[in-house]
Amino acid sequence: MQSKIQKDSPLLTQEEMYLFNCGEFYYSYRKFGAHFLEHKGRWGTYFAVWAPQARQVSVVGDFNGWCGMNHSLQKWEEQGIWTLFIPGLPTGEIYKYEILTSSGESVLKADPYAFFSEVRPHTASVIYSLEDYSWGDQAWLAQRKTRNPKVLPLSSYEIHLGSWRRTEDGRFLNYAQLVTVLIPYVKSLGYTHIEILPLMEHPYDGSWGYQITGFYACTSRYGTPHDLMYLIDQCHQAGIGVILDWVPGHFCMDAHGLGKFDGSPLYEREVHEQWGTYKFDYSRSEVRSFLISNAVFWLDVFHVDGLRVDGVSSMLYLDYGKAKGAWQPNRYGGRENLEAVGFIKQLNATLHGLYPDALLIAEEATDWQGVTGPLDQEGLGFTFKWNMGWMNDTLRYIGLDFPERRSFHQLLTFPMMYAYAESYILPLSHDEVVHGKKSLLDKMPGDYGQKFAGLRGLTTYFMTSPGKKLLFMGGEIPQFIEWREDRELDWFLMDYEMHRKYHGFVQQLNGLYLREKALWEIDGDWTGFEWIDVHNHEQGVIVFCRKGKSFQDRLVVLINFQPYNYERYRIGVEMAKGYREILNTDSTDFGGWGMTNPGLLKVEGVPWHGREFSLEIRVPALGAMILKPELA
């Protein structure tokens, strides 16, 4: 940012070049790229780019007729960095780097550090100043410093901005327009955070933002960087945190992007055959400076509250997505990518040092040990990890026909064997409602009513199981069709009673989650969870207790995964004056058939489930209920 650039020198210093070449210049975006600033009494734009193998680098754009003869950059030979100050060149101008490679080929490249880009399909960078936004989220940031996310509720609404809602003629809502509709909607549903699919500039809509060309440029599809600042600022002022998906594992192969930037493999190590992208080369210090600075950039400049790091498994393993014999083991003969491991640890150490209150979330799908373990204990240092095992087992189970479920009861119970091995987030994400996997509602067996009942049960299981929560947009309506990135959600479904009632159910359940300490106060170890009935595969019922620090905060959760009513179902409980049903998914308010348990439920001295006391309740088909003790 301009003020910080001018603090010492407006231009790159020798010390900063040294840090960059060592992989430790964590604010490289303040000097690399295009910066409108004052130098020697004149305003203009300063350019800096890393291209060590280039024979010549020029800046070209409309301002010089796309001819770089008069605007060649000076090379700092030892550092491989090229710089140039062009007096009088203002913000808003489009530009690219014209790079003459060692083989004599001339290529046009977008600026790796550009803050803004043309709207696709155009690919030029835009000179843009990130100054002059007045933030109003000071109270939010101050409060964030005092909070421990591991012992507080965290419920994220995952969203793809381009397909959440559109204008009547099918155009994207821009960042500023989303403020008036997205924030009240998320707030009304009771979510604590939104998690946004990648906003970094990308050429192809169908990549959902995961194949990036401009890591420092929020996509111009939805407006300007200042518009995005406004959206995040307003989220914070409304009490909503913002997490961004971040993709340091690979980048797209489009000609204007990072690939073969100076004619040589500069940012990339190899092709990711499975995804058709380039993998980053973590052995290069300058690539580490680029990527770690990028993470810092989003936390620093845009005030985001956390980063969800995409594709960590693909980074950690040398054989990821490769056939047998198509990869080389590391120096110890193993499959671990030691350079990627080193990068991740350096990344998390840096971010924890600069922003100790930021959330660092790993999408990691293997049994790698210590993903959320402390760095000083050989862990990777993430705050949370997506629990892909829980997600896979749960969605496999609920997709089974009712009779089959009896033989696969362990899919419900086995995830608790490792529920506290890491600090987990339970993800019902975008990846699970595309590519023929069906929507959450359509995964359910049974008729129309049973599908809704089953989904209410699943959602209750999701919200009451140990771990933080993430639900992809559309799951709260709920949609029958899969997510499609080229159109908005099926909002018309809210005209139908069952969808409207399910939407209200999600709202009520989120509110209960926020209120009930047992669901998050002891979310990180076994003292916060206890099985009551774990083996009832025949009836398809599980019963467990979630615990807070106080007995009066305890909750008893029962979920019936079979389409049968049980009129007198006995469960073992701790002694209390009685238990009150604080949620029943079969309530007619939620679209159920009304088989509930009103009033105070009497505790009896009948031993059951290894406890001295028990009570009887009515259990509805495919129903779930939450009971809370009342003291004498």
Swiss-Prot record:
EC number: 2.4.1.18
InterPro entries with a match to the protein in the record: A-amylase/branching_C (IPR006048), Branching_enzy (IPR037439), GlgB (IPR006407), GlgB_N_E_set_prok (IPR044143), Glyco_hydro_13_cat_dom (IPR006047), Glyco_hydro_13_N (IPR004193), Glyco_hydro_b (IPR013780), Glycoside_hydrolase_SF (IPR017853)
Cellular component GO terms held in the UniProt record: cytosol
Cited Gene3D superfamilies: Glycosidases (3.20.20.80), Golgi alpha-mannosidase II (2.60.40.1180), Immunoglobulins (2.60.40.10)
GO biological process per UniProt: glycogen biosynthetic process
Entry keywords, A to Z: Carbohydrate metabolism, Glycogen biosynthesis, Glycogen metabolism, Glycosyltransferase, Transferase
Catalytic activity: Transfers a segment of a (1->4)-alpha-D-glucan chain to a primary hydroxy group in a similar glucan chain
Active site per database record: 310, 363
Biological or metabolic pathway of the protein: Glycan biosynthesis; glycogen biosynthesis
Pfam families tied to this protein: Alpha-amylase (PF00128), Alpha-amylase_C (PF02806), CBM_48 (PF02922)
Entry-linked CDD domains: AmyAc_Glg_BE, E_set_GBE_prok_N
Superkingdom, taxonomy of origin: Bacteria
One GO MF term attached to the UniProt entry: cation binding
Cross-referenced HAMAP family: GlgB
Quaternary structure and partners: Monomer.
Family: Belongs to the glycosyl hydrolase 13 family. GlgB subfamily.
Function, as annotated: Catalyzes the formation of the alpha-1,6-glucosidic linkages in glycogen by scission of a 1,4-alpha-linked oligosaccharide from growing alpha-1,4-glucan chains and the subsequent attachment of the oligosaccharide to the alpha-1,6 position.
Entry protein name: 1,4-alpha-glucan branching enzyme GlgB
The species this protein was found in: Desulfitobacterium hafniense (strain Y51)
